[in-house]
Amino acid sequence: MLEDLRLYQLISPSLPVGSFTYSQGLEWAIEKGWVTNVTELKHWLSNQLMDSLATLELPVLAKLTQLLQQEEWQQAQDWCDFIIANRETKELRLEERQRGLAFSMLLPKLGIELNQTTLPMVKQTQVAAFALAANHWNLTPTKLAAAYAWGWLENAVIVGIKLVPLGQSAGQQLLLEMADVIPQAVEKSQHWPEHLIGSFTPAQVLASSRHESQYTRLFRS
């Protein structure tokens, strides 16, 4: 049970790495009227969940977990590089590294030691941090993937509540509905071919690139 509680701590939007400060382009999409209500937000998030998390982050997370456990350092580093290469805007790459840097300071406090090989990976991408935590706490791949997806979803809904804006009840209802999609995303990720790993979310990429120069904004991405 303690391992599960530690995992819940890692995926919290407010703690420990400040995920709440990022919208991943959603702030600009709301500003420009692409997302104006709970139905449109659900569509936006569903596309990201099934066409990015399920086809990029979650498959790479599973691979990194296995490779780091086997001490296949070079292959693990290659997948960390791959994650960064798939962050298609400057602020998305910066977000990935900022979260990774925060995890590099947090993990040792949780008893997960980093060495000269794993530290640069964690600083590069938070995905490596989750993989190391999974090995340290003996988490199953399915539990790890579901938790990672839930942390992303909860943060995105919080952004929607603040900016669309949505009421708290509408936000909770959206979480309930989207939670039903997470098992589908996890299953998809577990059967996704290696040669197809990547994301296809052009609207998010455009929104993120425009958010970089948005005049007034609350979020860092």
Swiss-Prot record:
What does the entry list under GO cellular component?
cytoplasm
One GO MF term: nickel cation binding
Q: Which domain of life is it from?
A: Bacteria
Which subcellular locations apply to this protein? Cytoplasm
Q: Keyword set for this entry? A: Chaperone, Cytoplasm, Nickel insertion
Explain the purpose of this protein. Required for maturation of urease via the functional incorporation of the urease nickel metallocenter.
**Classification via HAMAP family:** UreF
Quaternary organization: UreD, UreF and UreG form a complex that acts as a GTP-hydrolysis-dependent molecular chaperone, activating the urease apoprotein by helping to assemble the nickel containing metallocenter of UreC. The UreE protein probably delivers the nickel.
- Describe the family membership recorded for this protein in Swiss-Prot or TrEMBL: Belongs to the UreF family.
Q: Which PANTHER family match?
A: UREASE ACCESSORY PROTEIN F
Q: What is the protein name given in its UniProt record? A: Urease accessory protein UreF
Q: Which gene encodes it?
A: ureF
